[in-house]
A protein has these predicted regions:
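Short alpha-helical segments and helix-capping/turn motifs at coil-helix boundaries
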Residues: 26-33, 195-203, 277-279, 426-430
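N-terminal regions that are enriched for targeting/export leaders
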Residues: 1-13, 29
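Catalytic domains of carbohydrate-active enzymes, especially glycoside hydrolases
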Residues: 26-51, 287-288
């Protein structure tokens, strides 16, 4: 029988701490300890990439670089790169949310001090090795960010210098010379990110916790990939996207979803054996133990929308690379532990692709109660073994928020299905139903374990502002939360056998 396992979805940004956002510091190590005490196997996070306008981790300036907001200042103080006085500033009054505008203003000058101190000590062998090993993506990223900053953070298509827009060698050499200090800043901060992340990951792995990372299928239009490798995308002669990604209209979104990400030129990628994808996945597995690939159905067929469209209604389905891509990646990298995010519109081709790869798909418990239909494949009694079951994802409301907004008929069906008594919190009842399913792996969102309502929702798709800001406080992670999670983990045979400890 396959081993049954469980974990918790909690993004780094949502960890408690004194610097306005969760980091790779003490709170992250404490969270690993919480997972150990509750006998979990996995810690799932959202993408670790650099965030841009809108603060979404799914819209990054790079498919490879890390988000320097997660660099922990206390660790830099311990390393002698900062002083307590350097970080003594107002990081905001509300510890339950992230103020990205404040972070943008406050963190850069502090990180510049740390970089100066790092360089003053002399470049370490570890740093030199990192720069050499990661040069293929690190140098274009450092160039892109330094030049972008010199143009007031405008996307590369809006840069006033045509020569550097097209990355002409002479122009690039001039900018590299003029912005040498800025390039070094981005190299060093990526190194500090990498060092701190791998120290945290080692601690997790040493304590038998595996990290599930998240890889967006697409890159952003405002990204180093679009600037440095435009031949991998469907673009016009100026490098602008000819078409963009999204989702067709459905009952929840009558105009569809217009994401705006450029569409890949799959023919060009196929011609070089999908090496860009192999390198991207290899980089992901250097960071994570398991990788969830977002919008898996886009590899079978994707919704292509003209770049000039105002919404997603006039798009069309276009065939993706299919199994060819995963066959090529497997030949280059071997078997990979991947979770296929197969939510949304599914057809036979997507299902066949997922089954051909052998990747587990996803099940979302909230979806099962919509329509009050016992035949719904999203109810636990219909879950397959080879699936990862969630109460919800970052795009869903918390289960308490969902329950509050559901119809009376849906709530009644939900309560009857779960055999819930009035005294049992709905969040706990739904988690109990989830953990009792036959799916080999279940993942609880942290907000649901804390019984939080819609105010703790991570993201509302197709909206701007107020997303990606939720943070947990230290006080919220109580002994009763631990006792509940440990209880259902043991009751439904999901306890990590490596963790024989009592809740403290």
């Amino acid at each position: 029988m396959s081993k049954r396992e469980s974990g918790v979805l909690m993004h780094i940004s949502s960890l408690p701490g004194q610097y306005g956002i969760g980091t790779f510091g003490k709170s992250a190590f404490d969270f690993v300890d919480f997972l150990v005490r509750t006998k979990q196997t996995y810690w799932q996070i959202l993408p670790l990439g650099t965030t841009s306008y809108g603060d979404s981790p799914y819209q990054s300036f790079s498919a490879f670089a890390g988000n320097t907001n997660f660099i922990d200042f206390d660790i830099l103080i311990e390393e002698g790169l900062l002083t307590i006085e350097d970080v003594a500033t107002n990081w905001g009054e509300d510890e339950t949310t992230v103020d990205y505008a404040l972070l943008y203003e406050k963190r850069r000058p502090i990180l510049e001090k740390a970089v100066a101190a790092f360089l003053a000590k002399g470049k370490t062998p570890a740093y030199e090795k990192f720069v050499a090993d990661k040069a293929e993506w690190l140098e274009p990223f450092a160039e892109y960010m330094a030049i972008k900053e010199s143009f007031d953070m405008k996307p590369w298509t809006a840069w006033s210098d045509e020569a550097i827009k097209r990355r002409q060698p002479d122009a690039l050499a001039q900018y590299r010379e003029r912005l040498a200090d800025k390039l070094e800043y981005h190299r060093v901060t990526q190194f500090l990110f990498d060092e701190q992340w791998h120290a945290l990951k080692k601690y997790a792995n040493d304590n038998f916790i595996q990290i599930i990372g998240d890889m967006p299928i697409y890159v952003a239009a405002d990204s180093v990939e679009m600037w440095a490798t435009p031949h991998y995308f469907k673009t016009d002669s100026e490098g602008n996207p000819l078409c963009v990604a999204g989702c067709p209209a459905d009952d929840f979104s009558p105009l569809g979803q217009l994401w705006g990400n450029p569409i890949y030129n799959w023919e060009a990628m196929k011609e070089d054996g999908y090496t860009w994808w192999s390198k991207r996945l290899q980089a992901s597995f250097e960071l994570f133990d398991v990788v969830r690939i977002d919008h898996f159905r886009g590899f079978s067929a994707y919704w292509e929308i003209p770049a000039s469209a105002e919404n997603a209604t006039i798009g069309k389905w276009v065939k993706g690379p299919g199994y060819d891509l995963f066959k090529a990646v497997k030949e280059q990298l071997g078997e990979l532990p991947i979770i296929a995010e197969d939510l949304g519109f599914m057809d036979e081709d997507v299902i066949n692709l997922r089954e051909a790869t052998g990747f587990p798909g996803m099940k979302i418990l909230e979806f099962g109660f919509m329509g009050e239909d016992p035949k719904s494949g999203d109810l636990p009694h219909h879950y397959p073994v080879n699936a990862v079951a969630y109460t919800g994802t970052h795009d869903n409301d918390t289960v308490l928020g969902w329950y509050k907004s559901a119809t009376e008929e849906t709530r009644e069906f939900c309560n009857r299905y779960l055999n819930r008594c009035d005294e049992e919190p709905i969040s706990f009842a739904l988690l109990r139903g989830l953990y009792g399913s036959v799916s080999r792996m279940t993942v609880a969102t942290m907000q649901d374990l804390l019984q939080l309502d819609e105010t703790a929702r991570m993201n509302i798709p197709s909206t701007l502002g107020g997303n990606w800001v939720w943070r947990m406080t230290k006080e919220q992670l109580t002994e009763s939360v631990e006792e509940f999670l440990l209880g259902i983990t043991e009751l439904y045979d999901r306890a990590n056998p490596q963790h024989n400890v009592d809740v403290k």
